[in-house]
C-alpha cells in the first residue's frame, strides 16, 4: 500500500460502505469492529481533507439545533414544501423520500418532569438530541414508566441550569470521526455527574446508540 493509503480518498470510499451496524463485531471470530475503525479513519482523514457540508450539519446537530428551534414555527410550516425538499436533496443529498422531522414544543415534557413525585430512587435519563427536540412524547412515556416503577427521572439540563444546552453522548461526532468533539461531550457529562454527586446514580436512555 502507498504511504498515505490510510487517509486516501480510495479508503474513504471503502469506509463509506460501513453503515455502523456492528454486525462485523458480532459475527467475526476476532470481533473486528469496522465501525470503530471507520471513526478512527475519519478522524485522521478530515485532518487532510475537508468535510462535506452535509456531514458538518449532521455531526454538529447537538450544538446547532438551537438555530432551528429559534425559527421552529417557520421551519415546521415550510419543511415539507416539495421544492424546498428538492433543493435540500440537491445541495445536501437529503432524500426527498423522507419527511423532515418537526421541531416540538418542549413545554409538555417540562410539565411532566417537574410534576414528578420525589421518589427516593433516581435515575439519570439521557435525553438524546433527536428525542428532546423532535420526539418528546417518547421521553414523556419514559418518565411515566420510570415513575410507575418508583423511580424519579433526572434530565440533566432541567436539573442543572448551568449546563446551557442539553448534554450529548457525542454519537454524531463519533459517526463522522470528530473524536475530539465527542470526547469533549463526554467530559461535559462526566463533569455533570461529579459536580452533582451522581456517581452512584444509574444512567438510562431510549436511544441504544447513545448509551452504548
Predicted regions located by residue number:
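Iron-sulfur-cluster electron-transfer modules
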Residues: 3-212
Amino acid at each position: 500500500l502507498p504511504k498515505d493509503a490510510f487517509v486516501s480518498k480510495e479508503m474513504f470510499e471503502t469506509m463509506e460502505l460501513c453503515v455502523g451496524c456492528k454486525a462485523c463485531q458480532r459475527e467475526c471470530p476476532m470481533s473486528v469492529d469496522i465501525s470503530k475503525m471507520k471513526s478512527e479513519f475519519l478522524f485522521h482523514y478530515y485532518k487532510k481533507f475537508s468535510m462535506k457540508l452535509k456531514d458538518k450539519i449532521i455531526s454538529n446537530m447537538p450544538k446547532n439545533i438551537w438555530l432551528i428551534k429559534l425559527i421552529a414555527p417557520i421551519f415546521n410550516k415550510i419543511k415539507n414544501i416539495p421544492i424546498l425538499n428538492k433543493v435540500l436533496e440537491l445541495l445536501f443529498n437529503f432524500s426527498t423520500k423522507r419527511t423532515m422531522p418537526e421541531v416540538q414544543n418542549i413545554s409538555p415534557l417540562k410539565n411532566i418532569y417537574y410534576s414528578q413525585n420525589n421518589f427516593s430512587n433516581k435515575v439519570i435519563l439521557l435525553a438524546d438530541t433527536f428525542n428532546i427536540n423532535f420526539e418528546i412524547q417518547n421521553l414523556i412515556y419514559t418518565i411515566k414508566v420510570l415513575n410507575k416503577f418508583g423511580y424519579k427521572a433526572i434530565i440533566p439540563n432541567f436539573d442543572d441550569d448551568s449546563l446551557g444546552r442539553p448534554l450529548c453522548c457525542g454519537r454524531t461526532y463519533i459517526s463522522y470521526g470528530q473524536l475530539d468533539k465527542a470526547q469533549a461531550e463526554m467530559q461535559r457529562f462526566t463533569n455533570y455527574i461529579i459536580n452533582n454527586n451522581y456517581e452512584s446514580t444509574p444512567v438510562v436512555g431510549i436511544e441504544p446508540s447513545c448509551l452504548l
